[in-house]
């Protein structure tokens, strides 16, 4: 079956990096939970990292606890650097991201990108596993299984890059994988609470931006396009 092929690929990729890999999971999309479920079948001891921006909805925190209880993974919670966050808020306010795309990118950079880059360097990770898929958005259409040019000295592995959403949700149902409760309210993608609303794909993310603006925070893609 195709799913078993994906699981074998994930297993061999993880082994090829001497288990020095980390799964990056937002707990705001079902893809990350699918990969956690797959990893749990082959590794008793693996790490999941997630970024707590300070603006996440309660449903996301609830899922983190449910997933931790079911799969028993090691959880690393990454937080923004206090001084940078404080400076931005004092200069531009709590919700500066609504004012412009530039402010949105600045907020995402401080709350997500910089803390994540620091985490990878400090932990000397050789590979980051993500739940990116090609059909999630126009920005992600060129996503590949293995990508090498985003993170310094660290590969990015996208084991379900060629899956459809229907296949993801089929796996969730068949394997009883816990997912964010906001998906039942029409959110296909959940990020920070003030930056997410119900929508297909990533349409509900940063909805106030122009339609041609990349709906990306910068974690996986540089501003203006994919890898």
Q: What are the language-model segments listed below?
A:
Residues 1-227:
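Nucleotide-activated chemistry modules centered on ATP-dependent adenylation/adenylyltransferase
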């Amino acid at each position: 079956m195709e799913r078993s092929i994906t699981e074998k690929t994930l297993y061999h990729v993880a082994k090829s990096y001497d288990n020095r890999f980390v799964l990056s999971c937002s707990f705001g999309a079902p893809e990350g939970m699918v990969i956690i479920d797959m990893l749990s079948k082959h590794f008793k001891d693996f790490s999941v990292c997630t970024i707590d921006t300070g603006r996440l909805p309660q449903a996301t925190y609830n899922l983190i606890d449910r997933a931790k209880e079911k799969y028993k993974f090691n959880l690393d919670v990454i937080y923004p650097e206090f001084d940078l966050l404080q400076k931005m808020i004092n200069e531009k306010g709590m919700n500066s991201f609504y004012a412009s795309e530039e402010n949105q990118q600045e907020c995402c950079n401080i709350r997500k990108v910089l803390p994540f880059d620091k985490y990878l360097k400090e932990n000397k990770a050789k590979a980051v596993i993500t739940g990116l898929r090609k059909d999630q958005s126009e920005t992600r259409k060129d996503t590949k299984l293995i990508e090498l040019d985003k993170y310094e000295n660290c590969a990015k592995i996208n084991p379900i890059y060629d899956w459809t959403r229907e296949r993801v949700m089929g796996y969730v149902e068949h394997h009883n994988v816990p997912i964010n409760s906001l998906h039942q309210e029409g959110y296909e993608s959940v990020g920070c609470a003030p930056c997410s609303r119900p929508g297909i794909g990533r349409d509900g993310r940063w909805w106030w931006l122009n339609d041609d603006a990349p709906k990306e925070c910068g974690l996986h893609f540089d501003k203006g396009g994919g890898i």
